[in-house]
């Protein structure tokens, strides 16, 4: 992030959560010492939590606070590697679509779609496109969109029917509805699935790059919310984004490519067994 174009013109707010358990306090202290040495930004403000909020509550509180103050926000978690042009992409998109009410979210991550694009469209995808689902690995939004965020899972669920569940789940190719049900059952504490559901129910759109501008390196098993998984690993695009969609509608070719990726992402039974064995060996 420090090496991004526009970093030296950006205000950086770092939200440091408190330790969830006593044995984690030393690690939190080390992280807080590290972030105090960060430089390269126009302004840096560190918000140290005195009690553990957890990822979901920390994100919701931080985003709500900053969009109220600034009207828009760019959000990174601490396990992301970004292109040097990621901030430029976010800022350009935030300015371009500020008044487009249907555009509610800007994502920086995109699945590795090369094979899917080759089979669905020989001409490839545009640099950026609109899609229905909201990604959480590097994203941005506006106060006018965030005010539509509904944290109450029961209120969200009550607005879905079987058709909407089918569309929400990318025609049952992604476990988004399972995540909703698991949140309801107390099995996860995801802010992201509630945000996507909020966007979806408002018929909102998300802007995305066809080549990912971030990669999540938190899948090595060391992060709190991580798991060994290389399915979503990408090569970060190191070129600036220069074109944005004029038509405010979901890109059908991109949707088909994403659907194909999600349907085949886990590979054959043999590939799944190998991946499972690697996870067990690394545990």
What are these regions (language model features)?
Residues 1-75, 80-283:
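An acidic/histidine-cluster motif and surrounding catalytic segment
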